[in-house]
Amino acid sequence: LFFFVKLSFSQIKENRLSIAALELTKYKVTYDPSYFSISYPNGDVPSDKGVCTDVVIRAYRKLGIDLQKEVHEDMLKNFSLYPKVWGLKRTDKNIDHRRVPNLMTFFSRKGTVSIKSKKSEDYIPGDIVCWNLHGGITHIGIVVNKKTKDNKRYMIVHNIGNGQVLEDCLFDFKIIGHYSYKN
């Protein structure tokens, strides 16, 4: 009975993230990778702008989870564990949570790392997936509770340049990360 209750609670949380992500697709957002100075905690770039990471940040924020704060606090304590891709010597609460490699490190440390596979059944609503688009360009999205037209896999809410959209793109690029995070 305990296992059943635990599983049900987990599924509810995942479904809430899926619903939050789908809700984001109702709003017009222009892809804009600009650096913004934002408030802290609970800071966000202008609501009509964003990138792939902002989809994840905004969906979790709808659940009361502030990834800006959580990533920043973890980076303050564990800066050496995070990627050094940008040559920074200290944290930056305006941008750190908006970088895919930083979110991958955070989810690896604080969430659950799941198998990276080519099997659609390994990906369930509420999962976070990261891809390598090409040449080291990374991307992130959320698996949601909507199936593809052929009913073979769940779809993804992400922003790869056309705003916050729902697409069948799970296996379009090389998967480099697969996580769940429930705080």
Where are the regions that the model predicts?
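Active-site-adjacent structural segments surrounding the nucleophilic cysteine of cysteine proteases
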Residues: 10-50
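...with weaker cross-activation on analogous glycine-rich loops/strands in unrelated enzymes
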Residues: 13-18, 76-157
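Sec-exported extracytoplasmic/periplasmic mature domains
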Residues: 22, 26, 57-65, 72, ...
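Acidic helix-start/capping segments at beta-turn-to-alpha-helix junctions
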Residues: 33-53, 66-88
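Second-shell loop/turn segments in exported
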Residues: 38-47, 89-93, 114-117, 164-165
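Active-site-proximal alpha-helical segments within enzyme catalytic domains
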Residues: 52-55, 59, 125
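Low-complexity, Gly/Ser/Thr/Pro-rich intrinsically disordered linker/tail segments
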Residues: 151-183
